[in-house]
Design a protein with these regions (language model features):
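Catalytic alpha-helical scaffold of carbohydrate-active enzymes acting on polysaccharides/glycoconjugates
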Residues: 2-140, 146-164
Length: 164
C-alpha cells in the first residue's frame, strides 16, 4: 500500500510476514499435520521469506516441531505461541476437559473466554513457562482466533508480548 510522505510524494512499502500456527492434533482430517509444516518451512527457506510459527500447547510439547524450530535462524524465523485451549493445558489445573477430542474447534472448549480469569492466567503462565523451558526465552508474539481482553492485559503486562 502506498504511503504518503511529508513531501507529498508516495513511496511503496512492502511488508509481509507469513504466520503459520501449529497444532499437535487435527481431528477433522486424516492428514499428517507434520507434512504441511515441513512444506511451509521448505517454501519459506527456498524463497527466503521471513515468517512466524505460533505453537499451540500440544505442538509445544511435541519434539517433532520443537527440535526443528530450535535450529531455525532467528533472523528469518520467529517462534511464538498460539493460545487455544487443549486438553493437556487443562489437566495441570484440574479443569475438566469437555471437548470431543484433545483439541476441539468449538469455541466453548478452545477459546480462553470459556474459562474463569484465574484459570486463564494459570494457562497463560503454563504456556509461557513451558515455551521458555523449550526455547530459553519468552515468546514476543501470540496469536489466537479469539482472545479475551483479560488474557491480553495479563499476558502483555507479565510477559511483555508486543505482537498479537
Amino acid at each position: 500500500m502506498p504511503t504518503l510522505t511529508l513531501k507529498g510524494t508516495y513511496m511503496k512499502r512492502n511488508i509481509l510476514n507469513i504466520v503459520n500456527f501449529l497444532r499437535g492434533t487435527e481431528p477433522r482430517t486424516d492428514t499428517d499435520i507434520h507434512k504441511p509444516f515441513l512444506e511451509q518451512l521448505r517454501l519459506m527457506k527456498e524463497n527466503n521469506l521471513r515468517g512466524t510459527f505460533l505453537l499451540q500447547y500440544d505442538a509445544l510439547t511435541d519434539p517433532f516441531y520443537t527440535d526443528i524450530l530450535k535450529e531455525l535462524p532467528p533472523e528469518q524465523f520467529e517462534i511464538g505461541v498460539w493460545f487455544e485451549v487443549v486438553e493437556s493445558l487443562c489437566a495441570p489445573f484440574g479443569v475438566e476437559w469437555k471437548g470431543r477430542w484433545s483439541w476441539d474447534y468449538w469455541s466453548e472448549f478452545s477459546f480462553t473466554g470459556a474459562y474463569t480469569f484465574d484459570v486463564r492466567e494459570k494457562m497463560a503462565d503454563k504456556l509461557f513457562h513451558d515455551f521458555k523451558e523449550v526455547f530459553g526465552y519468552y515468546p514476543r508474539s501470540l496469536g489466537a482466533w479469539c482472545l479475551d481482553a483479560h488474557s491480553i492485559a495479563y499476558i502483555s503486562e507479565k510477559y511483555d508480548v508486543d505482537a498479537y
